[in-house]
Amino acid sequence: MFYLLIFLLQMKLIKLKTDLIKAIELDRRLGFVPTMGSLHEGHKTLIKTSQKNCKKTLVSIFINPTQFNNKKDYKTYPKNLKQDLSYLKKLKVDYVYLPTIKQIYWKKNNEIKLNKSQKILCAKFRKGHFEGVLNVLDRFIELISPQKMFMGEKDFQQFFLVKNYIENKYNTKVHVCKTVREKNKLALSSRNSLLNKKSFINSGIIAKKLLSLKNEIKKNKKNYKKMIFYLKEELSKNFDIKIEYLECRNTHNLSTNIMNKPFKLFVAYYINNVRLIDNF
């Protein structure tokens, strides 16, 4: 039997799949916000957007082991369940889903594989990461059947892949919400709590430099590769970071064809052993 742990704000506990279905069957305008906990203002934006557009909102908190290609990252991922539940209660979330690993992975993973053209950006450096993301969200959507799901723009490649996969398989629409940033322009992330003071400050400076680069590329796309090269050299030299990638990609298909097309500047780097990603 498939057991679940669902905490309602009234602290009503639902253990069975059938009970979950009964709880949400009258709420077909259900909005779903998947998270891994350590909630912040970025998650708040997703939740508020869901509440504005859906009758009820369900938030999941599940640190998914299959999307980590580094066991150390999984073990050290920030965990603040007590604070998260208090935060969600203040936001008046209708349902909070807290599954265990066994409850999610009670059956064998689906064979989800990225094609060659999709193995770019984070997929190039984090083997199996997006397959893990797609697998866990596939299970969530199959179980919950939300009308809409909300994701953050900071993880744009993830949003792009999830939207294509989920909308081709289910009746759930996947929506993206704008990135929320710290005062120093660093994108809000649960990983920010792992940064020391110096790394936090430097990451903010890096974000500002990347935003400036994006604006310069808009004015002169022909020389964008050279502009990226010089900034990579500057950042690596002055901020003691290891850059995995810094690339411009078409926002419609993530191709490198950005001439006369809308585009984003994507970055992933390590600073003080903490991996950060962003896009502008």
From Swiss-Prot:
* Catalytic reactions of this protein: (R)-pantoate + beta-alanine + ATP = (R)-pantothenate + AMP + diphosphate + H(+)
Annotated GO MF terms: ATP binding; pantoate-beta-alanine ligase activity
Matching entries from InterPro entries are given as: Pantoate_ligase, Pantoate_ligase_C, Rossmann-like_a/b/a_fold
The residues that the entry says bind beta-alanine are Q67
* Spans through the membrane: none
Q: Which GO terms describe its biological process?
A: pantothenate biosynthetic process
Pathway(s) this gene product operates in, as recorded in its UniProt entry: Cofactor biosynthesis; (R)-pantothenate biosynthesis; (R)-pantothenate from (R)-pantoate and beta-alanine: step 1/1
- Binding residues for (R)-pantoate: Q67, Q158
Highest rank taxon of the organism:
Bacteria
Q: Which residues form the active site?
A: H43
What's in the keyword line of the UniProt record? ATP-binding, Cytoplasm, Ligase, Nucleotide-binding, Pantothenate biosynthesis
Any idea where this protein resides? Cytoplasm
Q: What is its EC number?
A: 6.3.2.1
- Which Pfam families is this protein grouped with? Pantoate_ligase
Give yes or no: UniProt keyword DNA-binding: no
Its principal location?
Answer: cytoplasm
Also noted in the record is: The reaction proceeds by a bi uni uni bi ping pong mechanism.
Summarize the protein's role.
Answer: Catalyzes the condensation of pantoate with beta-alanine in an ATP-dependent reaction via a pantoyl-adenylate intermediate.
Q: Which family does it belong to?
A: Belongs to the pantothenate synthetase family.
The protein's assembly and partners = Homodimer.
- Tell me what this protein is called: Pantothenate synthetase
